[in-house]
Amino acid sequence: MAQQRRGGRRRRKVDFIAANHIEYIDYKDTDLLRRFISERGKILPRRVTGTSAKNQRRLTIAIKRARIMGLLPFVAED
């Protein structure tokens, strides 16, 4: 028997940075940056977080800077 698909509209993700009026994404703000990193330490994509392209680029740069400075890990510790 064929299964029926359950339809439904998914809720549009909101850009957290734009919604909270964050002008500058600081690499030293690790609490903010950790929201956009997976448990394994990877940067989460836009389709998961809902950030705009501009803010995703800024986040990526800030996360990479924080990793180099030693504020964030490159990979998660098991």
Curated annotation (Swiss-Prot):
GO terms for biological process: translation. PROSITE patterns: RIBOSOMAL_S18. SUPFAM superfamilies: Ribosomal protein S18 (SSF46911). One of its GO terms (cellular component) is cytosolic small ribosomal subunit. GO terms for molecular function: small ribosomal subunit rRNA binding; structural constituent of ribosome. Keywords: Ribonucleoprotein, Ribosomal protein, RNA-binding, rRNA-binding. Binds as a heterodimer with protein bS6 to the central domain of the 16S rRNA, where it helps stabilize the platform of the 30S subunit. HAMAP family: Ribosomal_bS18 (MF_00270). Part of the 30S ribosomal subunit. Forms a tight heterodimer with protein bS6. PANTHER family: 30S RIBOSOMAL PROTEIN S18 (PTHR13479), SMALL RIBOSOMAL SUBUNIT PROTEIN BS18M (PTHR13479:SF40). Belongs to the bacterial ribosomal protein bS18 family. This is Small ribosomal subunit protein bS18. It comes from Limosilactobacillus fermentum (strain NBRC 3956 / LMG 18251).
